[in-house]
Amino acid sequence: MGPLQREGRPALGDANVAPGSSPGGVWHQPQPPKDSAFHPMGWSLPKEKGLILCLWNKFCRWFHRRESWAQSRDEQNLLQQKRIWESPLLLAAKENNVQALIKLLKFEGCEVHQKGAMGETALHIAALYDNLEAAMVLMEAAPELVFEPMTSELYEGQTALHIAVINQNVNLVRALLARGASVSARATGSVFHYRPHNLIYYGEHPLSFAACVGSEEIVRLLIEHGADIRAQDSLGNTVLHILILQPNKTFACQMYNLLLSYDGGDHLKSLELVPNNQGLTPFKLAGVEGNIVMFQHLMQKRKHIQWTYGPLTSTLYDLTEIDSSGDDQSLLELIVTTKKREARQILDQTPVKELVSLKWKRYGRPYFCVLGAIYVLYIICFTMCCVYRPLKPRITNRTNPRDNTLLQQKLLQEAYVTPKDDLRLVGELVSIVGAVIILLVEIPDIFRLGVTRFFGQTILGGPFHVIIVTYAFMVLVTMVMRLTNSDGEVVPMSFALVLGWCNVMYFARGFQMLGPFTIMIQKMIFGDLMRFCWLMAVVILGFASAFYIIFQTEDPDELGHFYDYPMALFSTFELFLTIIDGPANYDVDLPFMYSITYAAFAIIATLLMLNLLIAMMGDTHWRVAHERDELWRAQVVATTVMLERKLPRCLWPRSGICGREYGLGDRWFLRVEDRQDLNRQRIRRYAQAFQQQDDLYSEDLEKDSGEKLEMARPFGAYLSFPTPSVSRSTSRSSTNWDRLRQGALRKDLQGIINRGLEDGEGWEYQI
């Protein structure tokens, strides 16, 4: 027993001694009382305090979850390197030291299956550092390492094949596949999840890894060895879904085509129609994510060119998954309900733009105008019913000199007697029926979209949905109070009037001039004004308390604005909004601190905070003004989808052409005539001429590099250019002509060559 070992307790090295006992006898750990919680420091706590401590610990863990996750990830990476340096086998695999590996593997005490801090084997490390020779030695000595996955929470399930694929080590991939590596292994660690703090999302299978890094050779190898192109990860995403989410759009389109070339066999459904867990196909996911490149690439597969007549082209576009008719989760509805701004750019793409324009002009705008007119008549009817509500002279005597009430509400038996009352009753019934219809229309959408999405989406008119639902409830509350002869019906009636008339602004979205302004008002109220109210509340609370303390010892008859604390708060609020001036009686002596406090309040409230609010609103106006066309298109789509969903099919026929009548199957199509600019064809011819000149120019440079540039460029045989002038206009024209030439020769700007014509000073080249 060591000198520091407590008597009666086992030493730390006594592995055969059971916990709670000692070699010389039995030692029992003291048990806490049944009605208390045991603290780790050794004393007992009451059960209630133990529960509070447990809840506090859970709250702390929840609050620091993200920071602790990042810190844990950093610590594990450092521990991984430390573990590699401590293990000769892992270090030899990292440094590709084949001789050391052979010696270690021949040693009987060497554990070939030893793992590092991440649960990785030596083969994982060799694959991570692209050490093919070391990996071959390890696979020869222990072939079962090929099937070993990593076991840490971060990289759980990752095999050496995953690492070789993502590093695009083709030779190592071939070696692993030759030794039976599983092509269906799934990497399910937290690093591979689709989360904001993860930099990459490549799915879980080796095939999706290969497709995302753009290795065509590895993709073919994996498919030839039995990789399932229809495999889905934990989110239900196939490899096509995962390609949609990649930032590199160019090779994503190439991999998309390559994978589709392997789709076929006995499957009845195309790989492009396989949905994920959210019910989104790759095409819909491209629209929701705002991936314009992939969306246009997929639309090229869906279009059928009928004929071309000079600059005119007639094209049939397949409306499957785009049109909201007959699809509960169409692309149009997904775009207007998503929170990503990039998705709204899809609304300006063909054929979505043409489909929305057709629906809006043919059905949406007329029905929306009729609906707006009906609502205005309805709210006028409700207003008249409120204005002429049943009142009678007051019967009771006044008991308070401040009470100036002359009329009071009639009882239910007295409210409907005269012909005027009957006319008002008709209007009240119309108001109640309208409120019930509003709730029947709005409540199903709340359950379908969810409360957060339905009331929080500005494009869907979220705040207006809150207004109209609250209005309907206020009307029903007013009805209940009228039927029960309850006093105070003026409260819900007043709220209903304000909310009902404010909802008229919702119908401004039907006009391009007024629609964006409704969004501007929403953003100012729920963005700028809400933040400003927090600052205003702090300032008012501070200065109201100061004013109350200053006038606390004064005569309230002389200085009545601050005689109690609630009145001080209200008076300070009026001062803040400059409704009243300094509410002080200057005929008497005022406290010295009043002048100082009021001067500071005037500077902070009037000069600083009100101008801050104006600046914030101006910034919001500037941002919304730059998006007004895009926002209005989104409003039109949201309104069109809403009307199409609510109206019966007989009032809203399906748009487009049914393919069944023309031998195109059961799909619906939209015919679009497009006129191509002939200047593009001219620019292409110029581009070809310039390309030939560049080839000749490069050949001349190789023959004689000592000649001058003007002598080496044989432009005269092809194009004649004006002699450069020193004037500003000629110099500018020459500069833009050179930009045109450079833009025409770039491979990645075909079709958008005119972007090269923009001048730095805002001048545009005219063709």
From Swiss-Prot:
Tissue expression profile of the protein: Expressed in duodenum, proximal jejunum, cecum, and colon.
Sorted alphabetically, the keyword list is: ANK repeat, Calcium, Calcium channel, Calcium transport, Calmodulin-binding, Cell membrane, Glycoprotein, Ion channel, Ion transport, Membrane, Metal-binding, Phosphoprotein, Repeat, Transmembrane, Transmembrane helix, Transport
Q: Name one GO cellular component term.
A: calcium channel complex
Post-translational modification Phosphotyrosine, affected residues: Y201, Y202
Which residues bind Ca(2+) per the record?
Answer: D581
**SUPFAM superfamilies from the UniProt entry:** Ankyrin repeat
| Matches recorded under InterPro entries | Ankyrin_rpt, Ankyrin_rpt-contain_sf, Ion_trans_dom, TRPV, TRPV5/TRPV6, TrpV6
Example of a GO biological process term: calcium ion transport
Each ANK repeat occupies one of these ranges, namely 84-114, 118-147, 156-185, 202-231, 235-276, 278-307
Q: Where in the cell is it found?
A: Cell membrane
Which domain of life does this protein belong to?
A: Eukaryota
Where does the sequence pass through the membrane?
367-387, 425-447, 463-482, 489-508, 529-551, 596-616
Task: Please write the reaction equations for the catalytic activity of this protein.
Answer: Ca(2+)(in) = Ca(2+)(out)
Motif position, Selectivity filter:
580-584
Q: Which Gene3D superfamilies match?
A: Ankyrin repeat-containing domain (1.25.40.20)
The stretches annotated intramembrane, by residue range, are 565-584
Q: How does it sit in the membrane?
A: Multi-pass membrane protein
Q: Which residues lie on this side of the membrane: Extracellular?
A: 388-424, 483-488, 552-564, 585-595
Q: Which residue ranges are recorded for the region named Interaction with calmodulin? A: 133-143, 689-707
Q: How is it modified after translation?
A: Glycosylated. Phosphorylation at Tyr-201 and Tyr-202 by SRC leads to an increased calcium influx through the channel. Probably dephosphorylated at these sites by PTPN1.
User: Per the record, which residues fall in region Disordered?
Assistant: 1-33
Outcome following mutation: L535Q: Alters subunit assembly via domain swapping and reduces channel activity
Q: What does this protein do?
A: Calcium selective cation channel that mediates Ca(2+) uptake in various tissues, including the intestine. Important for normal Ca(2+) ion homeostasis in the body, including bone and skin. The channel is activated by low internal calcium level, probably including intracellular calcium store depletion, and the current exhibits an inward rectification. Inactivation includes both a rapid Ca(2+)-dependent and a slower Ca(2+)-calmodulin-dependent mechanism; the latter may be regulated by phosphorylation. In vitro, is slowly inhibited by Mg(2+) in a voltage-independent manner.
**Family per UniProt?**
Belongs to the transient receptor (TC 1.A.4) family. TrpV subfamily. TRPV6 sub-subfamily.
Q: What is this protein called?
A: Transient receptor potential cation channel subfamily V member 6
Q: From which source organism is this entry? A: Rattus norvegicus (Rat)
Q: Give the lineage.
A: Eukaryota, Metazoa, Chordata, Craniata, Vertebrata
Gene name of the encoded protein: Trpv6
